[in-house]
From Swiss-Prot:
Protein name: Hemagglutinin-esterase
Enzyme superclass (EC): hydrolase
Originating gene: HE
Keyword Cytoplasm among UniProt keywords: no
Organism the protein comes from: Bovine coronavirus (strain LSU-94LSS-051) (BCoV-LSU)
InterPro entries (UniProt xref): Capsid_hemagglutn, HEMA, Hemagglutn-estrase_core, Hemagglutn-estrase_hemagglutn
Catalytic activity: N-acetyl-9-O-acetylneuraminate + H2O = N-acetylneuraminate + acetate + H(+); N-acetyl-4-O-acetylneuraminate + H2O = N-acetylneuraminate + acetate + H(+)
Glycosylation site list: N54, N89, N153, N236, N301, N316, N358, N417
Highest rank taxon of the organism: Viruses
Length: 424
């Protein structure tokens, strides 16, 4: 029993001599069941096409290029592919999901639907989209895109109403006004179908303001009706502003089924693409690496806003992004963050990744995995080790009981042996 305090004391001395096990600013994984979604900074195929071939273009270690655990596309992002004609079919599956993308839709692109629109609304949309994506990928293994087929019984076609620069919105699709309608005060519908996935992320969007057309102002109104369950999802314009508004989107998580898209005023919108979520898993927080430009170009913090514990851990560099290939590709700080993908780690937390699961100087917040259960609390001069007392108390009780049993047995056999000798 006297060995236990000495063991604790020795452990404290070892800790004071240098073992610290702090959380590290990396993304990593518990085992080989992981997947990364990214852009040019992790697009090995894009590197192959550069002339000369130059891996300094990436923040990803090239040793991971043949891992089969990466879905990345130069110049793209999941949000960009979700809404616009500039499309890449991000596809991947894993227990532990990592995202390092988003920079290819920022204030630098200054997207807005109309000349009097607002890029701020689109940054808000981006934040809402990634919030939904991160939350759901904490409970789903598989992500991919699927097309959403729809049937509209009118003669009008979809129109590219919402576009800016090289970006053209095609999800949701706008159905143009029928030729026999003199204005936009009409009701119109279209059927769409979701099948083949466990759940889907789909957009439901409206112009939240007074939309002007030919001297008339319109209030947008859009609904999705699940014909199988009777559930209806809807948005109505509530703002009275006439300028500075844009396309406000909500991102719904819907089950498979037959749906009806309904517009009571202005143009009908209907989803054409969806994030396909498959294979439910035990809750596993996703990891997100900040995706931003060099300070010479304007970035946003929407992935940071979207990534909140307990479903998401956010990792960022403390310095400006300065690449070695060019200012926006090959930054040492972000390369260091991604270097954690080269090895397994036992514990993840809001503060970072722990390399060991025994003791640490920092109590992990929102821990996941096999995490340290003890911490070194350092006063200015004296290191004090603080352990979870319950295991120590229980161990002490068990040792005490064992000693008592041993003593009782020894006394029993000594008395019994003495009796036998006396009888002889």
């Amino acid at each position: 029993m006297f060995l236990l305090p000495r063991f604790v004391l020795v452990s404290c001395i070892i800790g004071s001599l240098g073992f610290d096990n702090p959380p590290t600013n990396v993304v990593s994984h518990l085992n080989g069941d992981w997947f990364l979604f990214g852009d040019s900074r992790s697009d090995c195929n894009h590197v192959v096409t550069t002339n000369p071939r130059n891996y300094s273009y990436m923040d990803l270690n090239p040793a991971l290029c043949d891992s089969g655990k990466i879905s990345s596309k130069a110049g793209n992002s999941i949000f960009r592919s979700f809404h616009f004609t500039d499309f890449y079919n991000y596809t991947g599956e894993g227990q532990q999901i990592i995202f390092y993308e988003g920079v290819n839709f920022t204030p630098y692109h200054a997207f807005k639907c109309t000349t009097s629109g607002s890029n701020d609304i689109w940054m808000q949309n981006k934040g809402l989209f990634y919030t939904q994506l991160y939350k759901n990928m904490a409970v789903y293994r598989s992500l991919t895109f699927v097309n959403v087929p729809y049937v509209y019984n009118g003669s009008a076609q979809s129109t590219a109403l919402c576009k800016s620069g090289s970006l053209v919105l095609n999800n949701p699709a706008y159905i143009a006004r029928e030729a026999n309608f003199g204005d936009y005060y009409y009701k119109v519908e279209a059927d769409f179908y979701l099948s083949g996935c466990d759940e889907y992320i789909v957009p439901l969007c409206i112009f939240n303001g007074k939309f002007l057309s030919n001297t008339k102002y319109y209030d947008d109104s859009q609904y999705y009706f699940n014909k199988d369950t009777g559930v209806i999802y809807g948005l109505n314009s509530t703002e009275t502003i006439t300028t500075g508004f844009d396309f406000n989107c909500h991102y719904l998580v819907l089950p498979s089924g037959n749906y009806l898209a309904i517009s009571n005023e202005l143009l009908l919108t209907v989803p054409t693409k969806a994030i396909c979520l498959n294979k439910r898993k035990d809750f596993t927080p996703v990891q997100v690496v900040d995706s931003r430009w060099n300070n010479a170009m304007q970035s946003d913090n929407m992935t940071a806003v979207a990534c909140q514990p307990p479903y998401c851990y956010f990792r960022n560099s403390t310095t400006n992004y300065v690449g070695v290939y060019d200012i926006n590709h090959g930054d040492a700080g972000f390369t260091s963050i991604l270097s954690g993908l080269l090895y397994d780690s036992p514990c993840f937390s809001q503060q970072g990744v722990f390399r060991y699961d025994n003791v640490s100087s920092v109590w992990p917040l929102y821990p996941y995995g096999r995490c340290p259960t003890a911490a070194d609390i350092n006063t200015p001069d004296v290191p004090i080790c603080v352990y979870d007392p319950l295991p120590i108390i229980l161990l002490g009780i068990l040792l005490g009981v064992a000693v008592i049993i041993i003593v009782v047995l020894l006394l029993y056999f000594m008395v019994d042996n003495g009796t036998r000798l006396h009888d002889a």
